[in-house]
Amino acid sequence: MSEAIASKEERLVAYNANIAAADKDPSLSPETGKPLSKVNTIRFGAGFLVFGILWMSGLGIVSAVLLPMHYKTIEGADPDALVGIVNAFTAVASLVSNLMFGNFSDRSRSRFGRRTPWIVFGAVLGGVTLFLTGTTHNAVLLTIFYCACMFGLNCMIAPLVAVLSDRVPSGIRGTMSAFYGAGSTIGAPIGTMIGAFFIENLTVGFAVAGVLMFLGGIVAVIILPKERSADFLPKEEGSFKDILVSFRPPKFAGAHDFYKAFAGRFCMLMSYQMINVYQLYIIQNYIGQSVKESAVTVSVVSMIMMVMSLVGSFISGPVSDLI
């Protein structure tokens, strides 16, 4: 029976049956209960790859190059101190928004699916506020816009990452994760190289960054196979208190792998960002290069990082599926 004429009850039964079948057979999609076609496999891989490249390129333009330069234009501000203050606020915004939008998308029951509307909304919010970050010379407004950008970014990331468990067979999730990881890893140095090109034209650079982040969510939705309607799923019952409780992290006793992955990723990103965020200041203030010289150095370093990231990402995904 086609989805168009099936009742909501029949669609719910089929939905649960598909998930049960996929739990037993790693080649089956939890969404359809069938193996992915070659075309859809390619579309998932391409969608995750392009999404990672675009949003990370947009953010990389700003975080690694343009924003450190922009801090120097704010009268009376200490750029070094401002980097730490703004990043502290955006770190909190990222943590809260990732949990929040992941939870909200789980509870969505849209005819466009649970994830798609949030990805589109996040693309608009993230792109617009990333551009606005470069239009103000007020430290408070800048922090507000940049935090809003983190909300938009995580409004895309949390639902899109959930697509892996919602729609992709477990047997190829490692490979698909590698496509996303490769995209975001490649996107960072690409963004830095683009940012170096606009190091003396900040406003245009911020506009390009905003467009790239916006396109990240929109293009991903277009490339990925169309998400099925979620209007047949039963609504999540509960009070506001129940919603708050749902944000609680899992207990350590039953989630060892979660906390191992969390700790590993936290340490990896912290060590990377310790250098990346202050990279431009290190090159200009410690090494002593001019603005134009530092742009060339940033581009060369980014090219090296991109090549090595490509090699690592495309090896790790398939290997993880075999283990």
Task: Tell what function each PLM region has.
Residues 148-183:
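Cytoplasmic helix-loop-helix junction between adjacent transmembrane helices
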Residues 26-91, 259-264, 268-288:
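Helix-loop boundary and gating motifs at the non-cytosolic
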Residues 98-112, 312-323:
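Helix-to-loop junctions at the C-terminal end of transmembrane segments
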Residues 90-95, 174-197:
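Glycine-rich segments within core transmembrane alpha-helices of 12-TM secondary carriers
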Residues 3, 9-42, 227-263:
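Juxtamembrane intracellular "pre-TM" segments in multi-pass secondary transporters
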Residues 91-95, 99, 188-189, 306-314:
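Residue-level signature of mid-helix packing/kink "hotspots" within the transmembrane helices
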Residues 121, 204-222:
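Symmetry-related core transmembrane helices of the 12-TM Major Facilitator Superfamily/SLC fold
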Residues 120-137:
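C-terminal ends and interior cores of transmembrane alpha-helices
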